[in-house]
Amino acid sequence: MIEFKNVSKHFGPTQVLHNIDLNIAQGEVVVIIGPSGSGKSTLLRCINKLEEITSGDLIVDGLKVNDPKVDERLIRQEAGMVFQQFYLFPHLTALENVMFGPLRVRGANKEEAEKLARELLAKVGLAERAHHYPSELSGGQQQRVAIARALAVKPKMMLFDEPTSALDPELRHEVLKVMQDLAEEGMTMVIVTHEIGFAEKVASRLIFIDKGRIAEDGNPQVLIKNPPSQRLQEFLQHVS
């Protein structure tokens, strides 16, 4: 479903991804960890073309992301994304935020979009907050609206870029619960996070990126309980 073939990425003279080879299959829940500046968020953002790769090939659901003829909007319909900051429209209610994608991207009529939006708000536990504005919601509630909004365009995969790092500790669990539910439903997910407990419990695969390279790739329970390298062991001790 997602295939990196010898992918590198530069920002000016600085190389942030080095010759990445990676395959992610449908239904996998892949958690990517690594220190700040390691390239993990850049890798994630390349998947739906928020960042352009410098060399190599990147295939997402049969679409060659680095082909200039491929419409980036088509890629982003297939790969929903949730960011560290919620990026909700402040002048729209929770319901209207979730309706936005079906109306503008999928061309749904208003009745269809509202029905879907209400279903998704219920799915993330916010049916009773449908008519609240973002300023009236907690950070955890805003992030759950953001997840519902990403799901509203019916993507084939979901990308999460540190979705809990801006939240107070007591609010993180409600977002992680929604993500766990999605994983159990079989959604293909690629998640950049420092939530090691979540990775161990929910992920089917754990990738450790260091200095722009994939340093470890394997079973989360094995890598977390018995780190095969000193570098991973040091990182896990730092974030635990």
From Swiss-Prot:
Q: Name one GO cellular component term.
A: plasma membrane
The record's family statement is: Belongs to the ABC transporter superfamily.
Biological process (GO) annotations? glutamine transport; L-glutamine import across plasma membrane
Q: How does it assemble?
A: Heterotetramer with 2 subunits of GlnQ and 2 subunits of GlnP.
Q: Where in the cell is it found?
A: Cell inner membrane
Quick one: which residues bind ATP?
Answer: 34-41
Q: What is this protein called?
A: Glutamine transport ATP-binding protein GlnQ
